[in-house]
């Protein structure tokens, strides 16, 4: 007679390895663990990992591909045409924050890439098919950049935003968010962020974006025109 319990499908070993590596990176950092640390909780020996991946770097590149796939879906167009571009961008930036908070290992891998622009191993760069200045045109992130550019252009045509280079805008919001997540400490990554912390992070990012896109370059943090002294 059926027990009534649903069977949970066992993940392939390759996926289990990637999941454990993701957990370790979030907790210990990109260089804070060994393959033995990965193998132990899975109940396997290190040679078993080499049946699926050529090296530790190969594991990290494959994990990066997983994150790049998720990142490629950011800044999607509004489901309904005619929606206010500013409201859509605000919502997409909130989702951008959620993506980073939900994937702390991705944040740490991003910081490694920024820290090794030449030399070293740039895992996300390899996974995305090239350096950041090339990804708007090639590779899996091209669609994300295309959607962001279209959203910014819609805001410009609606008289909401000034004209900006989409990649410049992306670099600004990305950099501000990374700094917000790790400075002064990385408690937003290692712990469970409170609703207040999440709301403050989203508010900060939207404020930066709003000021950068403002038609009036003298717009201050309160949305008012700064007085020249």
How does the language model describe each region?
Residues 1-2, 95-98, 142, 146-158, ...:
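C-terminal peripheral helix-coil segments that are non-catalytic and often amphipathic
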Residues 101-131, 182-187:
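Amphipathic alpha-helical segments used for helix-helix packing
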Residues 62, 76-108, 169-173, 202, ...:
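Hydrophobic alpha-helical connector segments
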Residues 60-67, 144:
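Alpha-helical DNA-contacting segments of helix-turn-helix folds
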Residues 12-16, 24-58, 62:
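Helix-turn-helix
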